[in-house]
Regions:
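Active-site-proximal beta-strand/loop segments in catalytic clefts of secreted hydrolases
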Residues: 43-46, 76-79, 102, 114-115
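Electron-transfer interface patches adjacent to heme c in soluble/periplasmic c-type cytochromes
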Residues: 85-91
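Non-catalytic, surface beta->alpha helical segment in thiol-disulfide oxidoreductase systems
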Residues: 92-136
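Conserved redox-active cysteine motifs that mediate thiol-disulfide chemistry
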Residues: 43-57
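Short pre-active-site segment immediately N-terminal to redox-active cysteine/selenocysteine motifs
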Residues: 36-39, 44-47, 93
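A short beta-strand-turn-helix
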Residues: 21-37
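Thiol-based oxidoreductase modules, predominantly thioredoxin-like and allied folds used
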Residues: 19-22, 59, 63-83
Length: 136
């Protein structure tokens, strides 16, 4: 019985965090700095159909497949957190997927605007990750 409990706990600990249960922006930013990982922010709104679709049909499958394990992911609702959304976004189009990476020359911003496929988001994350210093 103890063996089953240990395996269950292990499965919970190593499973990716679903996008619906992501950490708040401020905590995600700190975690990205501490772990030297890209910060991926999906900016959207509940009323935005493309935002809901992108979250469920792009981000959620990527998370389930482990494609987000090398990044820190968070979601910012433009209506709930307008100040943070304004800082992160460029323009007013929703959704926006923004990736921040800290390289040798400081933080860089990469983004896509509008509904995006898994392929495009993966390409954006890969491109942003190329500026990360090599870990030894």
């Amino acid at each position: 019985m103890l063996h089953v409990a240990a395996l269950t706990l292990l499965a919970v600990l190593i499973a990716p965090t679903p996008p619906d249960e992501q950490i708040p922006y401020d905590a995600a930013y700190r975690k990205a700095q501490e772990e030297k990982k890209p910060l991926v922010v999906l900016v959207g709104a509940n009323w935005c159909a493309a935002c809901r679709t992108m979250k469920s049909e792009t981000i959620s499958p990527m998370n389930s497949a482990g494609d987000l394990k090398g990044v820190i992911f968070t979601h910012v609702d433009k209506d709930v957190q307008p100040e943070i959304a304004q800082q992160v976004m460029q323009g007013n189009t929703l959704p926006q997927i923004v990736v921040f990476c800290e390289g040798d020359q400081g933080w860089k911003r990469f983004s896509l605007t509008g509904m995006q496929s898994e392929r495009r988001v993966k390409e954006l994350i890969r491109k942003a990750s190329e500026i990360l210093p090599l870990r030894r």
